[in-house]
């Protein structure tokens, strides 16, 4: 909102959000023997969380909103639940690629986009190193 209202304080909000993220990481590590979970464990947890959100949480929110006469809000909760379903699928797909060791391999030509600079490559694998920003291939994602 600060940026929209042309105040030059939006950077303060962004910096504070980044600080809060780091604080959360500290607490998470303290609760998990100083470690962050593996990517595979994080994906499994994300799948579980998204599944809960789209099968229970947002439906319950929608039911309560409708009971209280807020049908427009209930409809938004239902729609957000549908978005959460796509999040679950996205995480499940990534988990499957990781398990099958195909995160950076494809049987067909695939569009690979650098998540750092936007460079686009087509092939069965991303390049070993980005031709623009020179980040390694793990910074590429399928389109």
Predicted feature locations:
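Non-heme di-metal
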Residues: 1-143
